[in-house]
Amino acid sequence: MPQTLPSAVPTPAEIAEALSRRILGQEEAVREISVALSKQLAGLRVGNILMIGSSGTGKTTLMRAVEGYLASDPVLVARSAVVRIHANVLGEEAERGRPGEVVLGRLLERAREQLGPSAPVDMLLRRAASGLVFVDEVDKIRSHVGGQSNVAGIRAQEALLTLIENEAVPLTLPAWAGGASVVVNSSDLLFVCAGAFEGLYDSVFDRVTIGRDRGALQPVTVVEGGKVAEKLVFHLRDWLRNEDLFDYGMSPQFLSRFDAVVLLQDLGQDELVRIFLETPESAFHQSRGYFESRGIHLAISPNAVRRIATEAGRQPRLGARALKEVFRRVIRDYEFDPTRSITGGALLIDLPEVEAVLGKA
């Protein structure tokens, strides 16, 4: 008979709505994560996800948003332990001959934090075995770098494979849990692996323009500035194939364990503006908190925000991180002397103040 979902399990749409308050402009990634998380919370088997996106496009922010979402609901906290780990750590553990122990150990500790120190060890192990594992910078465990074999990367991929597909992973329990050696079925873990995959964009572009698929990408006619011209329009999502990831250094066995490969989009000006104004972690909101602590209300005009976003957009490989660097240049003198240009207890940053630092667009 079909399995009936517990009534408390949120739908993918409900999860996506909550995550979208923290992560902007990455609808596909949010949808994939939301579906996978809803299934896992219901106790269903779910496929793993590989996220590819330039620095600053929101990979880590999305991971943190999921953690925050689960932590905000006591019912959900009791159903899923979540850990984040750097991919290279898996390689280091594999070299010590205990692949997977660090991940399962952290999940066990996380489950204990959530369920309390008096929770039975068997219950904690069950929670850990159905946890959510975010693996950051997974592109750093490629099998080769600069034409040279990367032994640590190979071992890390093998260690991650062991966790993803193995139903019998050995784990030595910590002292507080008795210190015994147990075997954990890790096949119910949900893995979300993410990386920037620097150089992948260029290698795929070369493949379809000057490489083995030369001519596959054809120029299109566009009108720019009132002039008709031919232009190559390239989007990685349209041309990325598994063999491109193989060539990058991710093994076929490793990639076959991911049901979805999600490409995060580089952020446009509209997304950068929203991130700057709407996300609580933005440089603007952090600076506003600083000024409020001194009794000053910080405001910024729409034109000034647009100019900052335009400048940040010139560094597409940095994504939203470029906003922090650009805004820092604008605001640092005001933060040094908070009383500068104050009118009626407020500081307004307008376009002239921004252009005085950045120049005209």
Task: Briefly describe each language-model feature range.
Residues 12-20, 141-142, 289-314:
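Short conserved motifs of the RecA-like P-loop NTPase core
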Residues 41-85:
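Walker A/P-loop
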Residues 52, 61-74, 91, 109-122, ...:
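Canonical AAA+ ATPase core
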Residues 61-64, 192, 203, 210-217, ...:
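C-terminal engagement/docking regions of AAA+ P-loop ATPases
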Residues 83, 133-136, 262:
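Hydrophobic positions in the central parallel beta-sheet of the AAA+
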Residues 84-92:
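A short hydrophobic beta-strand->loop->alpha-helix junction that borders the nucleotide-binding pocket
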